[in-house]
Amino acid sequence: MSGASTFPGYRLRFAEPEDSKALVPLINVAFLPEQEAIEGARINEEKLRPFLSSGTFVVLEDGQGLAGCVYAEIRGKRGYIGLLAVRPELQGRGLGRLLMARAEEFLSGAGCEAAELRTVSARSSLVPMYEHLGYQVTGTSKMPAEVPLKIPCHYIMMSKQLT
């Protein structure tokens, strides 16, 4: 996988099954700001399993282990991107942008014409970041009833043409 050479000391690759134990804490620490709106940890190994069987994770490694990840799933001509996570001390360095580019490259290579994602309205500060990457807001949707909300919020749906 190309691209990590622009970030010396990092290596991009697709996740292996043994990465699941490292993905859970990485995602949870990156999603800590969400806990102002949603009760509990973002993910556990049980909740991670369906992601691993339905799609793939692009992971970014450094000398300390996983530095970041993003989930990509092929859904016909439209791909889905989610669970973008970068260790907090590494955020703001362009690593999320690198991960998103590789996820989009994967989806495009699989024949997807567009990529879709969603973010929680309580983290609306993420919308400009995704817009900077070429995504546009396409609408909103309700949070599933089983999501333990602390405050009212919803999903902000976004999409980007890949071809």
PLM feature segments, named:
Residues 8-10, 14-20, 24-89, 100-102, ...:
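Acetyl-CoA-dependent GNAT
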Residues 18, 38-39, 43, 94, ...:
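Residues at secondary-structure transition points
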Residues 49, 57-58, 113-127, 131-163:
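C-terminal "cap" of GNAT-fold acetyltransferases
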